[in-house]
Amino acid sequence: MVLIVGFNLRTSIASFSPICRSLFLFPKYRSRIIRPVVLLEKPFDKHFYATDSNPLITGFPETSKNCPPSVAATKNRLLMNCTEFDDHGNVRVISGDFKKMDLCKQNGLLPRDLRKLNTSINSIVPVILVREGSILINLLHIRALIKANSVLLFDVYGSQHSHSQSQFIYELEGRLKQKSSDFGWLPYEMRALETILVSVVNTLDSELHVLHNLVSDLLADFELDINQERLRTLLIFSKRLSGFLKKATLIRDVLDELLEQDQDLAGMYLTERLKTGKPRDLDKHDEVELLLETYCKQVDEIVQQTDNLVGNIRSTEEICNIMLDANRNSLMLLGLKLSAMTLGLGFGAVVASLYGMNLQNGLENHPYAFYITTGSIFAFAAFLSSLGILKIRRLKRIQMALYHRCNLPISLDPRSLRPPYL
């Protein structure tokens, strides 16, 4: 942030050097220099702070880049970028600015309904709302408003789903341009809804395919070696799979809830309501019910595959924990054995230190005293070490109390578990 002091009106851009004038004419170089401000007040009356997001230079148009942050935020709250398709599938408006109040008035929506489609809010909860004359959908990268003769697609450019939405626009345009007879005489809104569900299922399927390949290769590597890097990678994939499973489960739950609401299913026939002016009977929604059930089963299959993959990861984690516990127990046993051997050697060192005090004990002139004492020390040290190691081995032979109480064989051979009458 740079402190800028206002200039007098006598100072003009023409008085600057050619380099300065070129910098003012090309906005991308303006951030590298100190930008003066032309004010109507007296010089040095006010102080202004100029930033890249709020350039205080007169003569430039007020755009989203040049306007103050508060003004840009207000515009973002009042406007929404949308792409509109007409009843023939042609793009009527590309990334146009629509006022939220106008959208609510034209489509009979409430502000809380439109909030669920707000692209500035990062929401992972999918939504399918059926309103009078429209269907609001928020699934993954698609946020759309379906009517009987138009589709309003809310842009999410700048996010991680921009590429997916760009592909979906071409798919939606192609399907809406086709005749209803090509889709079994489905009305306009059903074709748009089916296109959205196809895109959502394909996105989930492709993401699951990538995760499945990555996780399968990683689990295969665990059979060869377990190291810290692979454990860290397994943790990352486990988090990604958990998030994907939650996302797919929420979509399946939304479709299940919609299938249980007969009133919403009947209200999704927007073309018939527009022509007759009356809502469809509650018991006549076979087409949309079959449509939703088909894609609900596909999403449920994706959820089951993801759940199985998560189960494989958890099984691998449990096996890794068992192997790590076994290695840790082996190290503990080795430490106990070394401690037992150290105890025997320590006893021998104590006896040797007693003889090293240079005191008379009556064995100085005995011809075999040295050999007898040395042999006794080594024998007793070996006895203590062997006794400690035997005690440790007995700890390894402790069996589960279930085998002793039920008189079950300890062997894991399936033939030993057969009943006697077979």
Curated annotation (Swiss-Prot):
Membrane topology qualifier: Multi-pass membrane protein
TM stretches of this protein: 331-351, 370-390
GO biological process, alphabetically ordered: mitochondrial magnesium ion transmembrane transport
GO cellular component terms, A-Z: mitochondrial inner membrane; mitochondrion
Domain of life: Eukaryota
Locus of motif YGMN: 355-358
Similarity annotation: Belongs to the CorA metal ion transporter (MIT) (TC 1.A.35) family.
Function according to Swiss-Prot or TrEMBL: High-conductance magnesium-selective channel that mediates the influx of magnesium into the mitochondrial matrix. Essential for the splicing of mRNA group II introns in mitochondria by affecting mitochondrial magnesium concentrations, which are critical for group II intron splicing. It also suppresses a variety of mitochondrial intron mutations and its absence may disturb the assembly of mitochondrial membrane complexes.
Record's protein name: Mitochondrial inner membrane magnesium transporter mrs2
